[in-house]
Swiss-Prot record:
Name assigned to this protein: Large ribosomal subunit protein uL2c
Family annotation (SUPFAM superfamilies): Nucleic acid-binding proteins, Translation proteins SH3-like domain
Region entry Disordered, spans: 32-53, 218-242
Pfam name, any one: Ribosomal_L2_C
Upper taxonomic lineage: Eukaryota, Viridiplantae, Chlorophyta, core chlorophytes, Chlorophyceae
GO biological process, one term: mitochondrial translation
Self-association state and partner proteins as the record states: Part of the 50S ribosomal subunit.
Main location: plastid
Molecular-function annotations in GO: rRNA binding; structural constituent of ribosome; transferase activity
NCBIfam families according to UniProt: rplB_bact (TIGR01171)
HAMAP family the record matches: Ribosomal_uL2_B
Keyword Ribosomal protein: yes
Keywords: Chloroplast, Plastid, Ribonucleoprotein, Ribosomal protein
Amino acid sequence: MGIRFLKAFTPGTRNRSVSDFSEITTTKREKSLSKMNHRSKGRNNRGVITCRHKGGGHKRLYREIDFRRDKIGIPGKVMTIEYDPNRNARIALVMYEDGEKRYILQPNGLRVGDSIISDLQAPILVGNALPLRNIPLGAQVHNVEFQPGSGGQLARSAGALLDILAKEGNFVTVRLPSKEIRLISKNSWATIGQVGNLEAYSIRIGKAGRNRWLGKRPTVRGSVMNPNDHPHGGGEGRAPIGRCRPVTPWGRPALGQFTRQPKKYSSKFILRKRK
């Protein structure tokens, strides 16, 4: 992937960059793996906003991604590398020898024509999936399961990877992208390699309208609201918030407050907290 910088023909193109999509091999999606996806846009069943700053955006068709990689022992061939509007990573269309087609996340370095396989003793090659217990120390993996059989949930974003640090007993020690070090079952499956599209986070949005295309609504500061709308609101001109610490619109502590439950069952698997 490369990044293309636009010339400042208008204020909206000044300091704006886009992907050059050089890795994309086709613009036609696989219709059998696409479906309508009704997005909630931050509202519940009554239409009440439950998550602010969401709404609008371009319509999208959801691509069904194979996060489980459960085609055990059946080789597949990469047919295309495609753009997915629902994520910042690219997806690869794989044709298996039994005729089935599936989408997977495209690891960095996977090209059209490459062969991949999911097996207990699969070779340590980019795109292959196998249990963590059979992956050597120091390997980089993505699309890792929290629980065996749950499907990949960790390291699915563009450029994400997990480092395998140690193996002991029934667990494997891994380092997450957040620098958190935790234990995961050795029977959980993972895919070899790093998720592609490494430069996705280097793109400059350039203008507010581009975020609206993505379904992101404006974020208004509490200090410019009225006092009946936010605890930070009110006052004459640019007034301080009048509290010892920032709070949310509902009065809960914000900006630095830990949100993880202190007695959560999975805390025993975390060896070092994220930074």
